[in-house]
Curated annotation (Swiss-Prot):
Transmembrane portions of the chain: none
Family: Belongs to the eukaryotic ribosomal protein eS8 family.
PANTHER family: 40S RIBOSOMAL PROTEIN S8
Official protein name in the record: Small ribosomal subunit protein eS8
GO BP annotations listed: translation
């Protein structure tokens, strides 16, 4: 079944509201990417306006910036430690923007959106 992102068919009182237009293609959405940690898998999708998005469904490496000396390194992610988007994402190893992951060089906070851009960037935290 498709994901419809239009307005509700019910009023705040619970009564059914009468629609003055049909469902449009522009109101349909997609399932979330839910990027996991593992061997790299990327998928290209066509978005609105014939724009393309690269979805990382599985990612293994992260570009980490060290704020002390402003250097960047491409390192491997080990596991998800914390995710503010959903507490169940931690045990499923799903990464989103703002998640804290364990890397080879320490903890890093994800600053990019892997489900939208297909790349994982982060900042090293203490």
């Amino acid at each position: 079944m498709a994901i419809w992102q239009g307005s509700s068919l019910r009023k705040p009182s619970g009564a059914r509201s009468r629609r003055n237009k049909n469902k449009r293609n522009a109101e349909f959405g997609r399932n979330p990417a839910e990027t996991r940690i593992g061997d790299e898998v990327k998928k290209e999708i066509v978005a609105r306006g014939n724009c393309t998005k690269t979805r990382a469904t599985v990612a293994k490496r992260i570009n980490v910036i060290d704020p002390k000396d402003n250097s960047s390194k491409n390192v491997e992610m080990l596991t998800v430690l914390e995710n503010g988007a959903n507490s169940h994402f931690v045990r499923r190893n799903i990464i989103t923007k703002g998640a804290i992951v364990e890397t080879e060089i320490g903890k890093a906070k994800i600053t990019s959106r892997p489900g939208q851009k297909g790349i994982v960037n982060g900042v090293l935290i203490e």
